[in-house]
Amino acid sequence: MMKTMRIAAIPGDGIGKEVLPEGIRVLQAAAERWGFALSFEQMEWASCEYYSHHGKMMPDDWHEQLSRFDAIYFGAVGWPDTVPDHISLWGSLLKFRREFDQYVNLRPVRLFPGVPCPLAGKQPGDIDFYVVRENTEGEYSSLGGRVNEGTEHEVVIQESVFTRRGVDRILRYAFELAQSRPRKTLTSATKSNGLAISMPYWDERVEAMAENYPEIRWDKQHIDILCARFVMQPERFDVVVASNLFGDILSDLGPACTGTIGIAPSANLNPERTFPSLFEPVHGSAPDIYGKNIANPIATIWAGAMMLDFLGNGDERFQQAHNGILAAIEEVIAHGPKTPDMKGNATTPQVADAICKIILR
């Protein structure tokens, strides 16, 4: 008997509450079309509204509750008028990433037909690559502190942490991803000419890992010139792997090069499936447009397609669903309907309706 995939749906804040239901609707249409079963259970916490009533972002047993699910489908978090961003983020998404060991942040970068590219002369097909970001260690640690605070002798120290286990596992994932793609090409982001300890170590581990993948063509590029080449020569990239900080920068720069960050998805993966992985749109909660029913649901729908691909773990039905949703997204982006951010006048549900109809036709 086919397993029903159990998914925790967390709308969060702002437009997350508008786009996530539309994503669920599209995923259920895909399940109907390609013959598998999904069940969704909505969680009302991991939101600033929950914080305003309870003084915390999530209940004490959040880990136990979410561990029962195969995946987490997330909307957006943040309402800075009532809760500072560092509280809402560290109290929800960053907890998920670290305590569920979601050490891979995966961001597809793809130029769709119908989206004007800000880079001169680039066409659909020219930009199609992945950014693989280390998601749990590196430059984003809480180690450090201040001394002589508030005086002219104040000193602030922020430590980076790179472990053999942490570096090797993100590199292994990136090389495996590159091996699965036709071009079999990998670029590693570094800055070993400036960060004299951590980045030479990173480079050493890349070189050591590459020995296990002789068919992969790889290189390393310093982060400054790599950013420039994202803009000037995006067609040269296939899989780009980076530490937490560099990956954070590149994973926003990449989608910006395709014309909009607003339709970009993100996956926070625990590849071993010991814990549930999380799938979300890159955009935030957008308080300025919440309630107007004009939020673009495409990033959430694309994130849902990534979730199906991951949950299927090679199952052809899930791969077909992923590809079918992407084809439907491409058709809607090219021909409409479009929300105002893409120079249209459609509502959030109207875009999802169109994608569902394409999937089910």
From Swiss-Prot:
Its EC number is 1.1.1.83. It is an enzyme of class 1 (oxidoreductase). The keyword Oxidoreductase applies. It is found in: Cytoplasm. The keyword Magnesium applies. Mn(2+) binds at residues 224, 248, 252. It catalyses: (R)-malate + NAD(+) = pyruvate + CO2 + NADH. GO terms for biological process: malate metabolic process. GO terms for molecular function: 3-isopropylmalate dehydrogenase activity; D-malate dehydrogenase (decarboxylating) (NAD+) activity; magnesium ion binding; NAD binding; tartrate dehydrogenase activity. Keywords: Cytoplasm, Magnesium, Manganese, Metal-binding, NAD, Oxidoreductase. GO terms for cellular component: cytoplasm. Induction: By the transcriptional regulator DmlR in the presence of D-malate or L- or meso-tartrate, under aerobic conditions. Is not induced by L-malate, D-tartrate or succinate. Is also induced at high levels under anaerobic conditions in the presence of D-malate and its expression is more than 5-fold greater than the one under aerobic conditions. Repressed by glucose or nitrate under anaerobic conditions. During aerobic growth, appears to be repressed by the DcuS-DcuR two-component system, and is not repressed by glucose. Disruption phenotype: Deletion of dmlA inhibits aerobic growth on D-malate but does not impair slow anaerobic growth on D-malate. Its cofactor is Mg(2+); Mn(2+). Binds 1 Mg(2+) or Mn(2+) ion per subunit. Catalyzes the NAD(+)-dependent oxidative decarboxylation of D-malate into pyruvate. Is essential for aerobic growth on D-malate as the sole carbon source. But is not required for anaerobic D-malate utilization, although DmlA is expressed and active in those conditions. Appears to be not able to use L-tartrate as a substrate for dehydrogenation instead of D-malate. Belongs to the isocitrate and isopropylmalate dehydrogenases family. Aerobic growth on D-malate requires, in addition to DmlA, the presence of the aerobic C4-dicarboxylate transporter DctA, for D-malate uptake. Meso-tartrate or L-tartrate are not able to support aerobic growth. Slow anaerobic growth on D-malate is observed only when glycerol is also provided as an electron donor, and D-malate is used in fumarate respiration, so is not dependent on DmlA. PANTHER family: D-MALATE DEHYDROGENASE [DECARBOXYLATING]. This is D-malate dehydrogenase [decarboxylating]. It comes from Escherichia coli (strain K12).
